Design a protein with these regions (language model features):
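Domain-level signature for proteins that mediate thiol-based redox and metal-cofactor handling
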Residues: 1-81
Length: 81
């Protein structure tokens, strides 16, 4: 498989995962962490770290907006139990 194709597939899988998590707002981060060892916040931290490794300055808060589809504070107010 070509590197470019693999990268495109991985990006599509990431978007699907983010969309899936967005459709399951009933699943709390704590539940994700307890069951799988990662949560939405972890995805945001990884996103930010990978961007920085590639010379892009994306804060964790900005990455959370990508993962949550809104600010983290807004998501917490609406969906965190």
């Amino acid at each position: 498989m070509k590197t470019e194709t693999r990268t495109e597939i991985e990006a599509a899988v990431f978007r699907r995962l983010v969309n899936h998590l967005d459709s399951r707002k009933d699943v709390q981060n704590l539940d994700l962490m307890n069951l799988s060892g990662f949560c939405r916040n972890c995805l945001a931290k990884w996103y930010s770290a990978e961007a920085v490794d590639r010379g892009e300055e994306i804060t964790v808060d900005s990455a959370k907006e990508i993962v949550y589809g809104m600010t983290y504070g807004e998501w917490k107010d609406r969906y965190q139990k």
